[in-house]
Amino acid sequence: MYQAQRLPRSEFVPIRHLQYHVRVWGEAVPGQTPLVLVHGWMDVGASWQFVVDALSGAFATGRQIIAPDWRGYGKTALPGADNYWLPDYLADLDFLIDHYSPEQPVDLVGHSLGGNVAMLYAGSRPARIRRLINLEGFGMPATKPAQAPGRYAKWMDELKSLHRGDLQLHSYADATGVARRLMKTNPRLPQDKADWLAQFWAEPRTAADGATRWHILGDAAHKIINANLYQLDEVLEIYRSISAPTLAVEASDDSLGLWWKGRYTLAEYHERLKCVPDCRRAVVQDAGHMLHHDQPAQVAALLEPFLI
């Protein structure tokens, strides 16, 4: 099994009626910018371990690194809701940054969902972010008002499916089954890292009949579609308000094209990035959407010089 090189501690931070689980490497150092890492959809803060381990000693020593489990993921408590709203992630992040760095801005890195949140947060709270890195946080395809009736209907239908139990996440007989699932989703993930991730991505639970199965640490309600259409005009205005130097990183596999199949393309995403006042792009080679798992050394090598 993979052996973590830099061991974090677990902290629980009260945020908006939730106990937020946060993995923390190092201590706060006056004058040193904290680094905040936020994960993507159906993931956990532990996913960043491989990148943290790949950072050089010169960079990591004396810098506090913070990686929360978003609400409804990992060890962060479920909010007691049956669907999730993107603005809640921004507010949670705002409280989290205030807790760990009340007096100075932070460096913020987000992957996928976390990258989208990071971009929106950086444009909404520009004074709180020193430098920003977005890993594959592409946003969503543009929408039209005519889609609204169908979107609301789909949202209500999916809520009913959730409450019927139709959207429950699959459970596994053991941690090995969880690891196999991770490798099926990402064929580049090696066995040792999959085995290590499995213990943080899921947990064993014993049912009333005495049977124990491993359950994914993610709320099934995350599968519910957002009731509101993606408002591209609003997003681009927020991008224009980002003051932090920004690095947009994508994987060589073009996961955006593979997922949306022409409905939304890398070329469109690159056009959107032109709205960010100070933005540059980089590509991680031989990597897919989970590029921080596939090539942690490449990701770390991009992060370090940009965040110095």
What residues fall within each predicted segment?
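Conserved HGGG/HGGXW glycine-rich cap/lid loop of the alpha/beta-hydrolase fold
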Residues: V24-L78
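Conserved loop-alpha-helix segment in the C-terminal half of the alpha/beta-hydrolase fold
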Residues: R240-A287
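Catalytic active-site module of serine/aspartate enzymes centered on a nucleophile-bearing elbow/loop
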Residues: K274-I308
